[in-house]
From Swiss-Prot:
GO molecular function: hormone activity
The UniProt record lists the keyword Secreted: yes
Similarity comment: Belongs to the AKH/HRTH/RPCH family.
UniProt keyword Nuclease present: no
InterPro entries, alphabetized: Adipokinetic_hormone_CS
Chief location bin: secreted
Disulphide linkage map: none
Protein name, entry field: Hypertrehalosaemic factor 2
GO cellular component, as recorded: extracellular region
Residues recorded as bearing Pyrrolidone carboxylic acid in the entry: 1
Top-level division of the source organism's lineage: Eukaryota
Known role: Hypertrehalosaemic factors are neuropeptides that elevate the level of trehalose in the hemolymph (trehalose is the major carbohydrate in the hemolymph of insects).
Alphabetical keyword list: Amidation, Hormone, Neuropeptide, Pyrrolidone carboxylic acid, Secreted
Amino acid sequence: QLTFTPNW
């Protein structure tokens, strides 16, 4: 399962 992970 791929989820959006912000790299901020």
